[in-house]
Amino acid sequence: MAHKKGQGSTQNNRDSAGRRLGVKKFGSEFVRAGNIIVRQRGTKMHPGNNVGMGKDHTLYALTDGVVKFEYKDKSRKKVSVISQNFGE
């Protein structure tokens, strides 16, 4: 006969912390070069103009400007940064 009982509930009650994914800067929001715009797993959104992609598919701004979300085609989303020349 086993002399330990009730172990299942204590061994199974674990979970990993959330990964804090998602959009960090929203449409028409001002960003500086290097700001993270979207954290994602895989390319749910693709980089557009003035946006770079890291090795973990993070999208970030390459220049200062305003974020714009648009569709590349019917199914694929694209994120761009519209740079603004302030009185130059």
Curated annotation (Swiss-Prot):
Pfam families: Ribosomal_L27. InterPro entries: Ribosomal_bL27, Ribosomal_bL27_CS. This is Large ribosomal subunit protein bL27. PROSITE patterns: RIBOSOMAL_L27. Disulfide bonds: none annotated. The gene is rpmA. HAMAP family: Ribosomal_bL27. Belongs to the bacterial ribosomal protein bL27 family. GO terms for cellular component: cytosolic large ribosomal subunit. One of its GO terms (biological process) is translation. Residues 1-21 are annotated as: Disordered. The keyword Ribonucleoprotein applies. GO terms for molecular function: structural constituent of ribosome. Keywords: Ribonucleoprotein, Ribosomal protein.
